[in-house]
Amino acid sequence: MTQFSPLYEGKAKIIYATADPDVLLAEFKDDATAFNAQKRGSIQNKGVMNCAIASHLFQYLAAQGITNHFIAQVAPNKMHIRRVEIIPLEVVVRNQAAGSLCRQTGLPLGLALNPPLVEFYLKNDDLGDPLLTPDRLRLLQVATDEEVIQIRQMALAVNTHLSHFFAECGITLVDFKLEFGRRPTGEILLADEISPDSCRLWNRDESDPEKRILDKDRFRQDLGAIEEAYALVMQRVLAHSVS
């Protein structure tokens, strides 16, 4: 399918139009950013690894009944996706306390959260992606009350399936970020990506609090061995069936 000029370039992907107005091409980049792009760098082969991981996980979730924008992986670092209007929300699901939750609440790292915590953030780098209360969500009108309920339900369903998937890969899904989009029909689809860039993943074979980290925290915290961690996630994910 013909690739056209870029429609949008974000921190991790470039989005292109194609000959089909309903299909876009997502190209995954090796660029790495943290703290709302205040820290920048590059991770060798990250685009290829994240594309492979996301493609596999989108197929797995589709088999579990989670509708998403993935169509097909068409190159090592490229996938075709359905065109959606991205809802400007970042939806974070937390199974254990980590990251900003620990910093803002004083909860100890690794504290199990039962039920999982679901948080909505405004997708706006200039504002620092602020956490939204239900009233702020309603005030900003970025999604209807019905859409927010549906997105929350979908996020929890994704969490159930991905937690099981990663557990079978010997990995703990600590927390993760999701984005959603609207189809012209109003249907809500899971969008963006699922990868070590957007998930906090701990290796169950490691007890050391630094060695167990298999995600972008290795870049955030200057822990090194970033490529090796992403490669291990890719190896374990691709070895798991998508059905």
From Swiss-Prot:
Gene3D superfamilies: ATP-grasp fold, B domain (3.30.470.20), Phosphorylase Kinase, domain 1 (3.30.200.20). Pathway: Purine metabolism; IMP biosynthesis via de novo pathway; 5-amino-1-(5-phospho-D-ribosyl)imidazole-4-carboxamide from 5-amino-1-(5-phospho-D-ribosyl)imidazole-4-carboxylate: step 1/2. Pfam families: SAICAR_synt. GO terms for biological process: 'de novo' IMP biosynthetic process; cobalamin biosynthetic process. It catalyses: 5-amino-1-(5-phospho-D-ribosyl)imidazole-4-carboxylate + L-aspartate + ATP = (2S)-2-[5-amino-1-(5-phospho-beta-D-ribosyl)imidazole-4-carboxamido]succinate + ADP + phosphate + 2 H(+). Its EC number is 6.3.2.6. It comes from the Bacteria. InterPro entries: SAICAR_synt/ADE2_N (IPR028923), SAICAR_synt_PurC (IPR033934), SAICAR_synth (IPR001636), SAICAR_synthetase (IPR050089), SAICAR_synthetase_CS (IPR018236). Belongs to the SAICAR synthetase family. CDD domains: SAICAR_synt_PurC. The lineage of its organism: Bacteria, Bacillati, Cyanobacteriota, Cyanophyceae, Acaryochloridales. This is Phosphoribosylaminoimidazole-succinocarboxamide synthase. GO terms for molecular function: ATP binding; phosphoribosylaminoimidazolesuccinocarboxamide synthase activity. Keywords: ATP-binding, Ligase, Nucleotide-binding, Purine biosynthesis.
